[in-house]
Amino acid sequence: MVLGKRHIFVLSLFCLFGTGCSFRSNQLDALKTIFWEDSGPEPQWVLSWEGLTERVFAVNAGPSIFFANSDGILVHFNGVFVEKIEGVRLNSRAEMDISITKTEMDASEVFSYRGATSALGDMLCDPPEESISNLALKVGSVQVIKITQKCIIEDRVVEQSITLNQTRQLMGLQFFAHPARQPVTIRYSQI
């Protein structure tokens, strides 16, 4: 008789919750709401470096901006230059952790790169120059402020840049994290 009571209980529940049931039911919507998990915020920035492309979050901390993701990437932009990059894997074996310092020498700036165990080299740069230009978008364009800096690595002339919108909010960075490699780009994903 216990089995019969269970059947009656299940039928009662079905009648209670199943009444007026249709393809779109209030009961089903309520259950979805209870068990639905919010996936949370989505990263709005893209980091690119030598074939690696990662979506990252931008976290403002006073004058600094930290770019990070759940895979362990952390880039510290102090508002003037990137001074630290951690957790980037250009290949599956080694994680790169690089510290960057800037010193002024005469009318130039020297960026020094250091890995976890050794110095990686230096880059000599002219003072930054600011200009206004148009940035092409998928639809139309937007006027931006571009701060560029010409640099010399061994015998190569290279460029670093900071792109700001007209209210001087960051839109993109192009910088060197290692003097022997290509530049890193971090940009707002909507551009």
Task: Give the role of each language-model region.
Residues H7-I8, V56, I85, Y188:
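Positively charged, low-complexity intrinsically disordered regions
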Residues G18-G20:
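C-terminal motif of bacterial Sec signal peptides marking the signal peptidase cleavage site
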Residues I8-L16:
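Sec-dependent N-terminal signal peptides
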